[in-house]
Amino acid sequence: MMSRRKFLLLTGAAAAGAILTPQISAKTQFIESPEEVREKRRWAMAVDVERCTQCMEELIAKTGDEKIKPPCVVACDKENNVPEFEEERFDPQWMRIAKLKLDKPEVNPKEYYIPLLCNHCEHPPCVQVCLTKASFKRPDGIVEIDMHRCIGCRYCMIACPYGARCFNFIDPREGLKEVNPNVQMRTEGVVEKCTFCVHRIDEAVKKGEEPIPACVEACHKYGKGALVFGNIKDPNSEISKILRENIVVQLRANLGTDPHVFYAKLGGE
């Protein structure tokens, strides 16, 4: 039988617990998880092809070098620890510039310059073929690679219709003059690619700011402002307005990958 003294001690402890335990009310504000925050966003990039072409033509005319890297590529390499080796064939390319002509040169003989990078597809084939699930797509559309899981099988490189992935035949650190500590270093024997500067995105979202990838920042500071980045789930964002007001092209859209790099004003459209 419980003594009177023990009964009073137990009831007193229970009362104290009721007083000290915080009560959850309808007004309680819950902090959103990173996944919930990301689901509210879908990041994408838009390219003004006319401005990009003008930038490259002026750089080539000034330097005489058709392989010159424009400000966007230089900034991307520096920001993301992309190495440069003596033998160009070993260089990873997160962003590169391609020259192209339209299908009917007799109608429009003009040549255009466009940036090529990871398209962060809605249905990324690289993710589908990855043996170790190292390649994955976040709720906000960013396609990433977990370097700790990548075994360098290169199936993703074969599956990518945009040639956006590179294999590290050499330790990247051997081709770097300086290192950005904010970006993870890769190793020899793994695949890497553009991340839309995901470290900048996550930091900006935490602060309630608009993220700006390094290439976009450099394009507006040193180039022609051809690149625009933003959240296409926000109808008031600059990129949403561009997509509404222009005829845009997605590379190899017929493959059903739904790429999220959009090219505007290609062919004077």
Curated annotation (Swiss-Prot):
Chief location bin: membrane
Record: residues binding [4Fe-4S] cluster 3: 118, 121, 126, 160
Assembly and oligomerization: Consists of five subunits: an integral membrane subunit, a cytochrome b-like subunit, a cytochrome c subunit and two iron-sulfur subunits.
Name of this protein: Hdr-like menaquinol oxidoreductase iron-sulfur subunit 1
GO cellular component annotations of the record: plasma membrane
Keywords: 4Fe-4S, Cell membrane, Electron transport, Iron, Iron-sulfur, Membrane, Metal-binding, Oxidoreductase, Signal, Transport
Source organism (scientific name): Archaeoglobus fulgidus (strain ATCC 49558 / DSM 4304 / JCM 9628 / NBRC 100126 / VC-16)
Positions annotated to bind [4Fe-4S] cluster 1: 52, 55, 72, 219
Domain of life: Archaea
SUPFAM superfamilies recorded: 4Fe-4S ferredoxins
Any GO molecular function: 4 iron, 4 sulfur cluster binding
Binding-site residues, [4Fe-4S] cluster 2: 76, 194, 197, 215
